[in-house]
Amino acid sequence: MRVKRRKTVSCCTREISQLHGQSLKQINIGVGSLILTKHQGYEFYCKKVTFVFFCFFKISLNSAYLYTLYSDVRTEVAKMERVAWLEVVGKFETEKLTPNSLYEVVFVVKLIDSAKGWDFRVNFKLVLPTGETKERRENVNLLERNKWVEIPAGEFMISPEHLSGKIEFSMLEVKSDQWKSGLIVKGVAIRPKN
């Protein structure tokens, strides 16, 4: 059993429409790669470790956490085995998006049958390049079990003058010290909202 305090992991991106067989353009960016199509929707998946982010992703889990790698059909994800404090934070450059289009940011998660300790609401936050913050709380304990569920962090529209900024998104539960287990985070999707 390994106990870790803080971890930075490198991840890669995969375009949503890749699953639908559209042709893709891939761009290498440091440790990851970015794949684009016309509608500019992005889905983020980790290469090897727990959670998800674009190129660098920070996970901070109070004093200790333990996770197990879990293979899904299309990507490797991780299941939380023992978590006290949850802090998942990511950033994304908005220059890759289409100006004046409405986008949504969603976390893709699954709660397994044996999940415990999710009695406190989890905070989902989105910070825009303008500094505007969108925040919502979700009781993940009420999610349907053993099914991938999308939890929205927020919606946004990028104006041409803020095109070269960043959005930040996070999933936090830092108010309780209750040990939690059984949550699998598959990824974060940033995609056009129809």
UniProtKB/Swiss-Prot annotation:
It comes from the Eukaryota. Vascular tissues, specifically in phloem companion cell-sieve element complexes. The chain crosses the membrane at residues 49-71. It holds the Pfam family PP2. InterPro entries: PP2-like, PP2-like/Lectin. Its main location: membrane. GO terms for molecular function: carbohydrate binding. It is a single-pass membrane protein. This is Protein PHLOEM PROTEIN 2-LIKE A2. The gene is PP2A2.
